[in-house]
Amino acid sequence: MITRRSFMAQAAGFTLAALSGELLWAQLSRFHPTTLTVFKSPSCGCCSKWVDHVKAAGFAVEVHDEEDMDSIKDRLGVPSDLRSCHTAQAEGYLIEGHVPAEDIKRLLAARPKLAGLAVPGMPKSTPGMARPGAPAEPYTVVSFQKDGATQVYARH
């Protein structure tokens, strides 16, 4: 049985490890920001707002306006049931849809064996979609493998 003291020590250790990873990422990205290569429709306003969100979080962004997003998603291997309006690549990972910058940072700090992260569809409370004064709507970020297998990565 875990004692309260043991539980508290483990919780403190996990918290310290998480904060250390965030601090390390922040220090490294200050000198060499991670570049997100973003593919989006030239007419999509919410995609441009998401690009602003990730830039504000410290990412460098290279935007490619594309008319045929389905062919881009097919070529990159984005599972059809996870698709959204834009797709990004960062350090070998795919980022599909309105994934929060903090989740991308956590992914890049941990470097798990995944194909990427996705927010399927266009939930109203995600970065780039949220409207000031609108009620928050919970959404889920999922991780996915190349074979399409998914798992909950974060809930917001």
Regions picked out by a protein language model, each given a short descriptive name:
Residues A17-E22:
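Hydrophobic h-region of N-terminal signal peptides that target proteins for export
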Residues T35-L36, F59-A60, E91-L94:
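Short active-site oxyanion
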